[in-house]
Amino acid sequence: LDKERTFWIGTKGNGILKIFDYEVQKNISDCRSEILTTSNSGLGSNAVYCIRESNRNLLWIGDEEGLNFYSYRERRIKKLPLWIDNEEFKYIHDIYETEDSELWLASVGMGVVRARIGGTPDHPVLEKLQRYVVNGGEFGSNYFFTICKGDSLNLLFGNMGYGVYRFNETINGLEPLTTHKYENMNLNKVVPIIKDDADNYLIGTTYGVIKYASENSYQLFNAKDGFLNSTIHAILRHSSDNFWLSTNQGLIN
């Protein structure tokens, strides 16, 4: 839901559904809507993985083919090609813009990119691109699905297969959040990460939710605790101590 009360919904194959003047109490069928695809907009792909607000006059859009942005001034989507290490950066599943004009991108297959945002408030230009990978850049090791803002831990990145990484400014690279070896390897298949008010990280995996406080203090919640299903796709904060979880078999509150 953006500043104009337009509800943007990205789909995996059918582009973007825009619902105008959205209100929770309204029936969606009563709202004016529009579908944006590669055939009627500047989208690079109809598989749209993330839509994020910006401090500038635009929205960031990550899709199968890379990065796009929606210009509020021009009322249209534009593709923003990213080339690094002689290849185009694609499969963008999460985007995080910092207060000091840095943009972080998480890719499922190509690692993480950090860039400085230049240009104008209406038309960004990405500069000083740096790419961060694990295991020598091997494609299957660099499935990064999510970015979470930490405090002293800096940014956290969820990896499907290798757990949670954090960015270390000193070494200018990614390092594992924990050296703990879980007995069930599915706990290293991380999709969402969110922080609660007690400074715990709620880490969604394919084997439940890890409530992580520190290297030696964490709890696991999954189907054994009454969850409908242990595969967690998303975590949404409802209030300070109330969260919604989406699973393969429905929602959990």
Residue ranges and their predicted role:
Residues 1-253:
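Carboxylate-rich, polar loop motifs that coordinate divalent cations or form catalytic acidic clusters
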